A protein has these predicted regions:
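Tandem CBS (Cystathionine beta-synthase) repeat/Bateman regulatory domains
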Residues: 1-145
Length: 145
């Protein structure tokens, strides 16, 4: 399978944009960004450093289901601080294994100390579908001669 960097090279438009919040933003502000941008998770940055990740799942479990107020709660209260990351050279198969084993849907992609992207389970599934469609097309061409 291909490296993560190849997946990112095939992205277009806003799917290449990296969305972030700070630990001191309210959960409401984070949820608003998630909804406006149509993404499932945001990186949490503080002083230029990756300090966490916050997802729709975090909001649901730690705010909505506990009856807390998203306008009064901070991102730092619900974010995952011990973030699993991959680098641009990590193979997509390994990313899929990490996501499956850890039951997560997003992985920040870090090159050195710089966050260069966010990989989602959707990215991986779309890539698998494209690969399968290509294989089918090649097989059909071979069969037809």
């Amino acid at each position: 399978m291909k490296p993560v960097s190849e997946l990112f090279n095939n992205r277009t438009g806003s799917s290449n944009t990296l969305w972030s919040v700070t630990p001191d933003d309210t959960v409401f502000e984070a949820i608003k960004v998630l909804a406006e941008r149509g993404v499932g998770a945001l990186i949490v940055m503080e002083k230029g450093k990756l300090v966490g990740i916050v997802s729709e799942r975090d909001y649901t479990r730690k705010i909505a289901l506990q009856g807390k107020n998203s306008k009064e709660s901070l991102v730092r209260d619900i974010m995952t601080a011990n973030v699993l990351v991959v680098n641009p050279r990590t193979r997509t198969r390994e990313c899929m294994a990490i996501m499956s084993e850890k039951n997560i849907r997003h992985l920040p992609v870090v090159d050195g100390d710089t966050v260069v992207g966010m990989l989602s389970i959707r990215d991986l599934m779309n890539d698998i579908i494209r690969d399968h469609e290509f294989t089918i097309s090649q097989l059909e061409s071979y069969i037809k001669g």
